[in-house]
């Protein structure tokens, strides 16, 4: 390996794709070449949503350790439940390693039909973590569809109905973008492929 190749490798930002319920890691590995072409070093991290042997905190700490052991800047894309894990990872990032977070069709409100205790705990933790994330300068964007039978677009928006704030203010560093898609799985697939350029641009743009 030449010095130039080493320089490029070291300076290539890491992108961690975090799947939602089901942890279909192999599906996300299929889109890694697309994100590599956009200038990222892609990783797929299976959170373990269906793993009953470990509790939520062990899973979240495992993600935190994975991020901490990477060299260089880190960007996160969380699909569905994976978006909650991504934002909780940002809350745990005390060294400002994470430079951008995008969530796709992510539920910020827990509904019983989702039927996953790990996700319920993760959303509860997110409610506690979000106010403290206001001071961070990380760019965060929530992408959602026109219609989603699993996670309604309104559940992909953080407001005072789902997260209580004493000053009745909005979360200033979280942006929202609607994708012209229908359906939960299709929105995630389109976000990682067809609209990948749009999401990439949002990830790397400076916070407003």
Go through the PLM ranges and name each one.
Residues 1-13:
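Short beta-strand-to-loop junctions in surface cap/lid or active-site-entrance loops
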Residues 15-17, 26, 35-45, 55-143, ...:
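Serine-dependent carboxylesterase/thioesterase catalytic core
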Residues 22-30:
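Serine-hydrolase catalytic-loop signature spanning alpha/beta hydrolases and amidase-signature enzymes
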Residues 46-48, 178:
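Residue-level recognition of beta-strand->loop/alpha-helix junctions
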Residues 135-208:
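C-terminal catalytic-base region of ester-bond hydrolases, centering on the histidine
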